[in-house]
Amino acid sequence: MNSRQVLKRLLGRDELLVAPGCFDGLSARLVEEAGFDAAYLSGGAVARSMGIPDIGLVTMSETIERAAQVVATVKLPIIADADTGYGNAVNLVRTVREFERIGVAAIHIEDQITPKRCGHLDGKEVISLGEMEKKLEAALAARTDSDFCIIARTDARGVHGFDDAIARARSFAKLGVDAIFVEAPQSEQELAEIPRRIPD
């Protein structure tokens, strides 16, 4: 099995997948040596390692370069933070092809405006549900390997509230994305409610 098939199997289990964050080859190697099953290339961590804030300043090319270094260093499946896809649906086609080309197992795409902000900062804005659906449809159509996972992330919790975040996540799931990421739930109750309210 290749790393994409491994990740799909891990996501299909009925148990939690812990994928610690990394930002370069060394930090990814530490995740692997600690015995985890996958690693997450964090956009925020990449930005901080470059000495800049996570407010959309890191380019796709810089993220791709860092992701390629990580993929070359470890055998773990790598989930890469692709921010907003670096633009609209047209940009997202290239984003998917580039991340797929370098061998990451999955990317997640968020529904913030471009340029985006770290999901834990105030002042975030999200695009319309319709625009995000078009972006996700473009991403799904652009991949050439069906095992390359597309994860849809919503930052609507901190903008419009929990119910809107769930409504968006349910819409994303209906499009056929491989996983859903509801950013920044504000309680254990919300965390538990997310999988109950979003269909498999």
Model regions: which residues?
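Alpha/beta enzyme core
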Residues: N2-D200
